[in-house]
Amino acid sequence: MSARAGRLGIGIIGAGHVGPILGAALAGAGHAIIGISAVSDESRDRAEAILPSAPILDIPVIVERSELVILAVPDAELPALVEGLAATSSWRAGQLVLHTAAGFGTAVLAPAQALGAIPLAIHPAMDFTGTSIDIGRLGETWFAVTAPVPVQPIGQALVVEMGGEPVIVAENDRAAYAEAIEIATAFSRSIVAQATGILSEIGVEHPGGFLSSLVRSSVDNALRETSRPESIEPLDGEDF
């Protein structure tokens, strides 16, 4: 089975920073957005701005109508959501169920899988703003894909259709993966906040803009260094 075999009817549960963006990317690849759930006024506004043609529907209706259900909810809410929908026999055989939580693999989708649903855990390694700018950033983003081996090509195809690069992460490695994501995100925010605070105290206007080029180039250089083969030693007099 391949996500490229035809257009999927996609339902999105959660209109936070991630769900509408992934929905927009998949809609751009030719899939149909059946509906999206949104509770707060802020999430409704976000859904309407990013997916203006997608109706805002109740969760059971979305699950009933969708071939692919994207669960873009906070990690803490995911287990209860999956179990609750299983308790009402909402999941269907052959239906794709995809969650975006970094800290979970597909085990959390076991209640849906028991009813015949096909589980996928796909996490984009990106700090989302929840605005349309994120759609363009997907093209430079790696996605962690966790799924049973026969299902991995589906997850990889969906990532490619969203413009990203897929990398397989084993079920047992999801906790370590989530830790790495949290460290990178929290550290970056903490350091930037500390540095901009110091600049503000000494009277530098717009400290975020002042540090933008420095922070981006420093991070790029650090990432480039981690990708450098250890076997390559710089020649005397050369500065890589």
List where the protein language model places each region:
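Rossmann-like NAD(P)(H) cofactor-binding subdomain of soluble oxidoreductases
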Residues: 45, 55-133
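Internal alpha-helical scaffold of NAD(P)-dependent oxidoreductase catalytic cores
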Residues: 46-50, 112, 133-224
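Short, hydrophobic beta-strand segments that form beta-sheet elements in well-ordered domains
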Residues: 34-38, 97-100, 145
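NAD(P)+-binding Rossmann beta1-loop-alpha1 motif at the extreme N-terminus of oxidoreductases
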Residues: 1-64
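Hydrophobic Val/Ile/Leu positions in short beta-strands of Rossmann-like dinucleotide-binding domains
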Residues: 11-12, 71, 145
